[in-house]
Regions:
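Enzymes that bind and transform nitrogen-containing heteroaromatic metabolites
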Residues: 1-233
C-alpha cells in the first residue's frame, strides 16, 4: 500500500545559464518582486525544506518576511548533521525546526539540538555517506509532523534527490538576467544526473509571467507522471 506524502513545490531562482550561485557562493539573483513571490509561496506551505549545504552556505532563517502570513515549519535534511549548531534555524526561535538525520551523525550534536527544542528524527541511511530516503522523510512529514504542502528551496544536491525519487509535484523557477558560468558554480539540480531521455523528469507548462521588474520571467510547471505522458501531444 502506497503511503501518503505532502504536495511538493520546488521554487528556485536561477541565472539564464541555470546556476543558482557562483563558485564562491554568491546567490544574489532575486529582485524584490521575486522575493515577495517566494515568501507568498512560503507562507502558503506547511513546511519549507532545505539541505545541509544551504544551511552551511547561506545560514537562512526561512521565515515569512515580505508578506503577511505564518512561518512554516523549517525542515533540514542533513544525513551526517554537518549543519553548524550556531545556525539561525537552531538559535533564533522564530519557528518550529525539524531535522532529519541518520544514525551515523554525532550523538552529542543530536542531543544538543534536542535540548534547544529542535525536533530531531534519526533514520537509517541508504549508504555510508548518510544519504536519507526522501520518500521516508516525506511520509514522516505527512503522518507525524502533519505537513500537507511543502516547499523545497534547495540546494542543488537536495533537489537532485527529490527529482531522482520522483517526489516533486510542481516547479516554480524565476529566470534572472545574469550569466554566471563556471563548472564549479552551483546548478539548479546537481548530482549525477539522468543518463537517458527515458529517465528525464518531464514537465508541463502551467504559467509564464513577466516579473514586475520587467527583467525576469517566472515560470510554473507541473511534473508529468507516467500516466499523464500518454495524454501529452
Amino acid at each position: 500500500m502506497r503511503k501518503r506524502r505532502p504536495y511538493v513545490i520546488v521554487y528556485v531562482t536561477s541565472s539564464v545559464d541555470g546556476k543558482i550561485a557562483s563558485r564562491t557562493g554568491d546567490s544574489r539573483l532575486s529582485c524584490p518582486h521575486d522575493l515577495r513571490r517566494l515568501h507568498e509561496v512560503r507562507a502558503s506551505c506547511d513546511a519549507v525544506v532545505v539541505g545541509a549545504n544551504t544551511v552551511i552556505r547561506d545560514d537562512p532563517s526561512l521565515t515569512v518576511r515580505y508578506v503577511r502570513g505564518s512561518n512554516p515549519i523549517r525542515v533540514v535534511i542533513d544525513g551526517m548533521l554537518r549543519s553548524p549548531l550556531n545556525a539561525k534555524l537552531f538559535t533564533d526561535g522564530q519557528a518550529r525546526t525539524v531535522v532529519y538525520t541518520s544514525v551515523l551523525s554525532p550523538r552529542g550534536k543530536v542531543n544538543e539540538l534536542r535540548k534547544r527544542g529542535v525536533d530531531v528524527y534519526v533514520l537509517e541511511p541508504m549508504n555510508s555517506s548518510g544519504t536519507l530516503s526522501l520518500t521516508k522523510v516525506l511520509e514522516h512529514l505527512y503522518e507525524v509532523v502533519g505537513a500537507r504542502k511543502v516547499l523545497v528551496e534547495g540546494g542543488g544536491t537536495l533537489l537532485w534527490y527529490f527529482f531522482k525519487e520522483r517526489l516533486v509535484d510542481e516547479v516554480r523557477i524565476t529566470v534572472s538576467p545574469y550569466v554566471i558560468g563556471g563548472e564549479e558554480a552551483i546548478s539548479v539540480v546537481e548530482g549525477e544526473g539522468f543518463s537517458s531521455r527515458e529517465e528525464w523528469v518531464k514537465l508541463r507548462l502551467k504559467n509564464v509571467k513577466l516579473c514586475e521588474c520587467g527583467n525576469e520571467v517566472h515560470i510554473i510547471y507541473e511534473v508529468v507522471r507516467k500516466r499523464m505522458i500518454r495524454e501529452l501531444p
